[in-house]
């Protein structure tokens, strides 16, 4: 039985993950907590401070307020009938995925909803945040696809021909 759902939100203005969590909370009757993990001293802000750009730290705080405000607006419009809250937590070392898993333990959440995300092409050694959350918790994890990750539009002609060729190919299994 799911009584409490934790949804991880970020700076992406697409609210599809948050709306998926709202639908799940409404379906199960659970309360919903949206969490934004904020790195209070990101490397890019510290690099800016070194060169006299002190607005970087203020920009981090403004970004935090913007995400929290966006969550509250979505809650007011789409989740007016369920118990919700939006919180921000500091990163406190480690990765964002590990912090979300720890926060789910602190709240005793029954399910964590995260976005599918995408792997970095430049930092190939880093895992997707959704993979880290799933590995670092024993709680149920729902990986929700964002709008840009969905494949609602029809595939191209070449992809369609390739799929037909794969489907019509005979299957051969080697037996020992």
Question: Where are the model-predicted features located?
Answer:
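Small/aliphatic-rich secondary-structure junction motif
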Residues: 1-53, 136, 163-176
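Glycine-rich, Arg-bearing micro-motifs that act as flexible, cationic patches
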Residues: 111-135, 150-152
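Short, flexible loop segments at boundaries between secondary-structure elements
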Residues: 139-154
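A short acidic, glycine-rich active-site loop
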Residues: 52-69
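Conserved beta-strand segments of the P-loop GTPase G domain that flank and frequently precede/overlap
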Residues: 7-9, 35-37, 87, 114-115, ...
């Amino acid at each position: 039985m799911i009584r409490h759902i934790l949804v991880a939100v970020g700076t992406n203005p697409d609210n599809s993950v948050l709306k998926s969590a709202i639908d799940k909370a409404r379906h199960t009757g659970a309360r919903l907590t949206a969490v934004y993990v904020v790195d209070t001293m990101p490397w890019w802000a510290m690099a800016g401070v070194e060169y006299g750009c002190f607005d970087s730290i203020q920009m981090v705080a403004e970004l935090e307020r913007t995400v929290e405000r966006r969550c509250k607006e979505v809650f007011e419009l789409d989740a007016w009938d369920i118990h919700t809250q939006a919180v921000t937590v500091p990163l406190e070392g480690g990765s964002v995925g590990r912090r979300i898993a720890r926060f789910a333990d602190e709240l005793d959440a029954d399910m964590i909803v995260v976005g599918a995300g995408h792997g970095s092409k430049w930092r190939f050694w880093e895992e997707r945040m959704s993979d880290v959350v799933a590995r670092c918790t024993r709680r149920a994890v729902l990986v929700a696809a964002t709008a840009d990750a969905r494949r609602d539009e029809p595939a191209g002609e070449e992809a369609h021909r390739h799929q037909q060729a794969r489907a019509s190919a005979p299957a051969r299994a080697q037996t020992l």
